[in-house]
Amino acid sequence: RDKARRLAGQTAVVARRLGLEDGYRVFMHGGLLLNAPRYAEAFRQCLDMYSEAQFMTCALTGHAAVAAWAETLDRVPEWASEWRGDAPGTRHPELPPTERRADSGPFLDALDAAGIVDLMIRREADTCAAVAACASEIARVVGLAGRVLEGGGRIFYIGAGTSGRLGVLDASECPPTFGVSPDRVIGIIAGGDTALRNSLEGEEDRPEHGGRDLAAHSAGPGDLVVGIAASGATPYVAGALEHARAAGAPTVLVCCVPRPAIAADTVIALDTGPEVLAGSTRLRAGTATKMVLNMISTGGMTLAGYVC
């Protein structure tokens, strides 16, 4: 009920800011509002506390709704940057592997509990192979991490979303594991500590914030900066690595696409392929990424003499 009340409050705020009078229409759409009667009823009751609204169902949804709406327009909307119809045969850029749907296998929502577990286990089976294919690049970074730590330098992990959380996780595990101070391996996430628990949309799209957050720690030639971006294109990470290069720090990119847009001294491109839930890189991509971070921190600490 708390989440339904929160959604109702947000709906009421939007209606007020749009200047809508009582009796405005609220179209019920989405998994919870359509398939969870108790949630939908709680939402209606909570919204009624703020204002009077008409609750409607959608005659059309998704692409069909957008197409039908577009046909009613007689001019290009001011906010539209491009308005065109593609000719037959037009080719569009391919989605990155992590965003595609697997070529074979059942849809996740068609399976029962045992089927979901079996499918996810089978899909994760290739994760180790994806990491093994990058063994030489990982070993190079482990050696560099060892030299940096032995010389008194620091390792920085920087990323957004799941990638940022994995970096912060690995960094936070180093003090209790190796007996080092928290400033030897530092995790930085777009949006700060709040983003560890709550999604902050838009922060990952600001390269200047990546540079700013890294600059706050005065990273320099004696440090190692590891950018983490499953897509290989996160602007926040690109900005951080650009700042690191300008400061003279060696840079590493850990990604899950074959041709990342971000440049780094060493690129670890993990071929994890499509996720069982398309686009959800907290799954296979996240598993492979954490394996690499484990190797960098554990291997680096070992070479620097913290394991005996």
What are these regions (language model features)?
Residues 1-2, 110-111, 118:
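A mobile "lid/hinge" subdomain adjacent to the ATP/sugar-phosphate binding pocket shared
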Residues 1-86:
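ATP-binding/phosphotransfer module of carbohydrate and carboxylate kinases, centering on a glycine-rich
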Residues 9, 133-148:
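A short, well-structured juxtamembrane/interface segment
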Residues 20-22, 151-152, 219-222:
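Short helix-loop-beta connector
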Residues 80-108:
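N-terminal amphipathic/basic leader segments beginning at the initiator methionine
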Residues 124-129:
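Short glycine/proline- and acidic residue-enriched helix-loop micro-motifs
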Residues 149-150, 245:
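Anion (oxyanion) recognition and catalysis
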Residues 155-292, 298-307:
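Glycine-rich phosphate-binding loops that contact phosphosugars or nucleotide phosphates
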